[in-house]
């Protein structure tokens, strides 16, 4: 009897049907589900990349700083990053110093570039609506502080920008068709006869209308061209108040001096009563 029951159970079509026939197939995964399922794998790969980069960075920074790697075998990630930042800042300062020593205009270019970037950031923050007000204020304040520090920078051998004297203005030469501004080689020294210092504001001499119009002021002295092509220097009284260096007087395009001797402005006791020194007189 038990054998007959076993035969009936084995011959039943329901028992012979596999269980997988009654189950429904799996639905395809959506993009979000796929991201969720692959997120642990991506996180593991990201951590592995970070650790590998930090390991290489640790080796490089210890070699650059010439430190024994055996004594720094257990450095934290934050320590490695801080050492790298300090090393890069030192390299940047060294490169800036070397560049300034070879070309002083580098600092001006750097200031101009930083100022342009700061203006662009300010322009963007003033038009962008999604930036927090506190963040905007802090960022602009930080850029302003950096700009102040950059303006205070000087290259080796240069004084502070606020202490530098402005360059002297280029002198204006006397009027003439073929005369360039006074910049010849060391000029001959010419004696300054007496009486060459009229009081300020007084008319120096009676020249023609064209000669009077051509009179120019050069370096504190009034230059009066003579009809024969030479020039006369009118020296104010203040030039003889204190002793000073010898005053060079330039002559016409012939390049010759009127006299072989030279006197100092302090020799005011030998002045004569002439109102003006005329080099064309012998």
Swiss-Prot record:
It is found in: Nucleus. It comes from the Eukaryota. Expressed at high levels in undifferentiated neural precursor cells, but the level of expression decreases as neural differentiation proceeds. Signal peptide: none annotated. GO terms for cellular component: chromatin; cytoplasm; nuclear matrix; nucleoplasm; nucleus; protein-containing complex. Residues 10-21, 264-275 have a biased composition (Low complexity). GO terms for molecular function: chromatin binding; DNA binding; DNA-binding transcription factor activity, RNA polymerase II-specific; DNA-binding transcription repressor activity; DNA-binding transcription repressor activity, RNA polymerase II-specific; E-box binding; histone deacetylase binding; HLH domain binding. SUPFAM superfamilies: HLH, helix-loop-helix DNA-binding domain, Orange domain-like. Pfam families: Hairy_orange (PF07527), HLH (PF00010). Interacts with SIRT1. Transcription repression requires formation of a complex with a corepressor protein of the Groucho/TLE family. Interacts (via WPRW motif) with TLE1, and more weakly with TLE2. Interacts with HES6. Interacts with an FA complex, composed of FANCA, FANCF, FANCG and FANCL, but not of FANCC, nor FANCE. Has a particular type of basic domain (presence of a helix-interrupting proline) that binds to the N-box (CACNAG), rather than the canonical E-box (CANNTG). The C-terminal WRPW motif is a transcriptional repression domain necessary for the interaction with Groucho/TLE family members, transcriptional corepressors recruited to specific target DNA by Hairy-related proteins. This is Transcription factor HES-1. It comes from Mus musculus. The gene is Hes1.
């Amino acid at each position: 009897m038990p054998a007959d029951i076993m035969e009936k159970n084995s011959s039943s079509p329901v028992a012979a049907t596999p269980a997988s026939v009654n189950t429904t197939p799996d639905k395809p995964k959506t993009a979000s589900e796929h991201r969720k399922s692959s997120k642990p794998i991506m996180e593991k790969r990201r951590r592995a990349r970070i650790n590998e980069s930090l390991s290489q960075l640790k080796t490089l920074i210890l070699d650059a700083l010439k430190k024994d790697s055996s004594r720094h075998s257990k450095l934290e990630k934050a320590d490695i990053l801080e050492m790298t930042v300090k090393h890069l800042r030192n390299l940047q300062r060294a490169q800036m110093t070397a560049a300034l020593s070879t070309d002083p205009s580098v600092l001006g270019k750097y200031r101009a570039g930083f100022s342009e970037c700061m203006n662009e950031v300010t322009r963007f923050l003033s038009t962008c609506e999604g930036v927090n007000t506190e963040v905007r204020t802090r960022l602009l304040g930080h850029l302003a502080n950096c700009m102040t520090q950059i303006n205070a920078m000087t290259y080796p051998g240069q004084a502070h920008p606020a202490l530098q004297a402005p360059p002297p203005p280029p002198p204006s030469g006397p009027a003439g068709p073929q005369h360039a501004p006074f910049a010849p080689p060391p000029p001959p020294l010419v004696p300054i006869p007496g009486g060459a210092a009229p009081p300020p504001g007084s008319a120096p001499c009676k020249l023609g209308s064209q000669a009077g119009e051509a009179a120019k002021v050069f370096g504190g002295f009034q230059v009066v061209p003579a009809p024969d092509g030479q020039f006369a220097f009118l020296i104010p009284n203040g030039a003889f108040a204190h002793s000073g260096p010898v005053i060079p007087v330039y002559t016409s395009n012939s390049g010759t001096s009127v006299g072989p001797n030279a006197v100092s402005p302090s020799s005011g006791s030998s002045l004569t009563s002439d109102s003006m020194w005329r080099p064309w007189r012998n």
